[in-house]
Regions:
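Active-site neighborhood of HAD-like aspartate-dependent phosphohydrolases
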Residues: 1-48, 182-183, 197
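Short, acidic loop-to-helix structural element flanking the phosphoryl-transfer center
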Residues: 2, 85-112, 118, 122
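Conserved SAM-binding loop
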Residues: 20, 92, 110, 145, ...
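Phosphate- and divalent-cation-binding pockets in alpha/beta enzyme and binding domains
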Residues: 30, 58, 95, 120-123, ...
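Asp-based, Mg2+/Mn2+-dependent phosphohydrolase catalytic module
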Residues: 1-10, 101-104, 117-201
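A metal-dependent, Asp-based hydrolase signature
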Residues: 52-82, 102
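Short beta->alpha linker loops
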Residues: 26, 50-54, 91-95, 116, ...
Length: 201
């Protein structure tokens, strides 16, 4: 685990799933269940490789690989239903959450930049009673281009009214890491609540 000096940053943009919350096992389980209902076995790595991507785009990727997904809309809706049935069990990653609280205490602006739906973000923040710590939410519902496109992070900077050099992204998934690079923002790469490396813009 590396040590990071967060003092230069005035804006913090946190990915949600796999970064701030340990939700990926819950997402994978939901995806696998829907796949099973469509008579095929889904490799967990397929989902982990697409961390940060929208559910819609993940289903399109499944379709491209020849999987029977039926209605894309219904497939996504069923996955969301299964995930949300267990959302109150999803824990926070403590080290990443500490970065958030310490940044907030010194007056930095806090945004969540995620490929998940807004309702999931709102529920997670309420479940853990941390809604008051987050200034802005940029969800899958708020953008037209999803990670690895930089729109999520560009919108976060716009809302925070800060330039890239004053911001940092905290991310675990390759699409989000690529999005941060495209937005010219420093990116702290995390894995299972460990700080792996700091990618400079």
């Amino acid at each position: 685990m590396i040590n990071v000096d967060f003092s230069p940053y005035q804006g913090f943009i946190f990915d949600l799933d796999g970064t701030l919350i340990d939700s990926m096992p819950f997402h994978v389980k939901a995806w696998q269940q829907v796949a099973k209902e469509h008579d095929y076995v889904l490799d967990p790595q397929f989902i982990y490789d697409r961390g940060g991507c929208s559910s819609y785009n993940i289903v399109l990727d499944l379709q491209k690989q020849g999987c029977n997904v039926g209605s894309v809309k219904d497939f996504v809706a069923r996955k969301v239903e299964l995930y949300r049935s267990n959302i109150n069990q999803v824990p926070l990653f403590k080290k990443v959450f500490n970065v958030l609280t310490e940044a907030k205490e010194r007056g930095a602006k806090i945004a969540i930049g995620t490929g998940t739906q807004r309702i999931n973000v709102v529920d997670i923040l309420q479940i853990h009673q941390i809604s008051h710590l987050v200034d802005f939410i940029i969800s899958a519902d708020d953008v037209t281009e999803h990670k690895p496109h930089p729109q999520t992070y560009l919108k976060a900077m716009e809302l925070m009214q800060l330039p890239p050099e004053q911001c940092i992204v905290i991310e675990d998934g390759m699409p989000g890491i690529q999005a941060a690079s495209a937005a010219h923002i420093d990116c702290l790469v995390v894995d299972n609540d460990q700080f792996i490396k700091l990618n400079k813009a």
